[in-house]
């Protein structure tokens, strides 16, 4: 799996560094005819998602600072206003009444030419500081190699933590503190210092930052403060292990943790982070006196095209997970397309009876359902390829499928006239079930449950699958279906299906969020 730093290394030299100012719209009123033509082309691009959040154009990556504020959900995300490749990181901004239906607002944060964030406003978090909306984010600026904390073979960035506040209801305008609120440790072994997250206990704020040390491993550095501006370093909240392999990018070798997040869930605490090609979840206990996290269970958050995880509380106090769905096609293709990346659907997190982290797409996504397809099991035609259920035509490939099966081994395909478009193959191997989704292979321990549960969301080139609320596999499909999609199952599996439902889903805008 390609990590975020690899995107920086590959695309950084091609990035367009602009001097865009805060509150610049994604499309400006002075745009040329060429720009209007781009908007029209993006609005009709069959590979561009229709109900996932994404910018009007160009590149996006990490979701940043999701927050429920004054009755609305605000999502910020890493954005390049100048091109559909990584570079010149700003904070784009969108707002929603329900975490599903989004509209774009002006850019929230832009690099300050003479500031500590001159080369980018990187990932961060948003919190309510006694009635004041406050963002803490990582600012980066090119520096001498000996002062840099991010070294990827292309850049030598010094990473510091910066703060900005907003006083308007829609969080349209932000005022930055003139100076960084936190400098990195003076340690030559440091592999990074970015992606802050926060929580509060009483009058004390705690700040965690993704970091690591060469030939030791990634970690979360823990700080505390009473005012979000003066910080005291405590110790690592959690630490990992180096893989033992040398790498130019310390994320690849487990020597750096990106995008950490930490929060209570039920009676446990959960730590999320990305390192060594995986997005990791850990469930355990927080020692409230020593402020050290002790891991009890560990797993993979999503096995596919998913990175830069971020959580928030919804209006009911539920823990909601977001992630960046990156492109899986060559740079030349998505650069020419004029857009890259989107935000995942909101996933509701919980702790299972076995102590594992569980997830499902939040029920607010039900508002997308426009039509229910009737799929009785007797509507089956036997073919050489297996049992074919009644064909489903998802307009613009906006659809949802949910099914349950008693079969330990099974195959579930979506086919068009050209062949297999999306497939899931489950094979029992001893005490393990091997799941294969469009070439992505996942090992799933055998379950004592009488049936397995699958939930699939299709949106143009995006497919989000969750199995048994434990295994998420997000994939990209860069081929428009040739005609209606047919559901194809093994003959032996058909009788084992206990439930099968399908819905046509609505687009959340008339122009694929290009305005």
What do these predicted regions represent?
Residues 287-291, 296-304, 312-515:
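Beta-rich accessory regions
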């Amino acid at each position: 799996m390609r990590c975020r730093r690899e995107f920086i290394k590959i695309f950084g030299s091609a990035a367009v560094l602009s001097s865009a100012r805060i509150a610049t719209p994604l499309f400006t009123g002075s745009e040329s005819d060429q720009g209007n033509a781009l908007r029209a082309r993006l609005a009709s691009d069959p590979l561009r998602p229709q109900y996932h959040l994404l910018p009007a154009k160009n590149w996006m990556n990490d979701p940043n600072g999701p927050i429920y504020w004054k009755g609305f959900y605000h999502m910020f995300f890493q954005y390049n206003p100048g091109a559909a490749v990584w570079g010149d990181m700003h904070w784009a901004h969108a707002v929603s009444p329900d975490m599903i239906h989004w509209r774009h607002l002006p850019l929230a944060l832009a690099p300050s030419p003479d500031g500590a964030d001159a080369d980018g406003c990187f990932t961060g978090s948003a919190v309510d500081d006694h009635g004041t909306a406050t963002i803490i984010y990582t600012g980066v600026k090119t520096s001498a190699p000996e002062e840099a904390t991010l070294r990827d073979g292309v850049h030598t960035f010094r990473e510091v933590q910066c703060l900005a506040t907003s006083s308007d209801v829609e969080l349209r305008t932000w005022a930055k503190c003139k100076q960084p609120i936190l400098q990195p440790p003076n340690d030559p072994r440091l592999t990074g210092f970015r992606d802050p997250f926060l929580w509060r206990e009483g009058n004390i704020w705690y700040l965690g930052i993704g970091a690591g040390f060469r030939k030791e491993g990634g970690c979360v550095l823990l700080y505390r403060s009473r005012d979000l501006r003066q910080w005291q370093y405590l110790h690592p909240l959690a630490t990992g292990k180096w893989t033992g392999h040398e790498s130019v990018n310390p994320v690849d070798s487990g020597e750096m943790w990106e995008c950490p997040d930490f929060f209570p869930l039920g009676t446990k605490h959960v730590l999320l982070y990305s390192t060594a090609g995986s997005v990791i979840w850990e469930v355990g206990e927080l020692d409230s006196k020593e402020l050290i996290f002790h891991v009890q269970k560990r797993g993979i958050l999503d096995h596919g095209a998913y990175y830069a995880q971020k959580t928030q509380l919804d209006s009911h106090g539920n823990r909601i997970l977001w992630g960046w769905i990156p492109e899986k096609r060559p740079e030349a293709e998505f650069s020419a397309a004029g857009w890259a990346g989107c935000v995942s659907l909101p996933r509701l997190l919980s702790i299972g009876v076995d102590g594992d982290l569980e997830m499902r797409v939040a029920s607010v996504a039900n508002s997308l359902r426009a039509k229910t397809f009737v799929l009785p099991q007797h509507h089956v035609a036997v073919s050489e390829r297996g049992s074919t259920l009644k064909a489903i035509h998802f307009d613009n490939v906006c659809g949802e499928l949910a099914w349950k099966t008693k079969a330990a081994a099974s195959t579930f395909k979506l086919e068009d006239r050209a062949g297999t478009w999306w497939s899931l193959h489950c094979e029992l191997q001893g005490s393990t079930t091997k799941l294969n989704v469009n070439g992505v292979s996942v090992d799933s321990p055998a379950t004592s449950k009488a049936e397995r549960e699958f939930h699939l969301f299709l949106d143009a080139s995006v497919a989000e699958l969750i199995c048994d609320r434990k295994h998420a596999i997000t994939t990209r499909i860069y081929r428009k279906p040739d005609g209606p999609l047919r559901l194809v199952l093994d003959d032996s599996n058909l009788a084992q299906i206990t439930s099968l439902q399908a819905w046509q889903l609505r687009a959340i805008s008339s122009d694929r969020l290009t305005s």
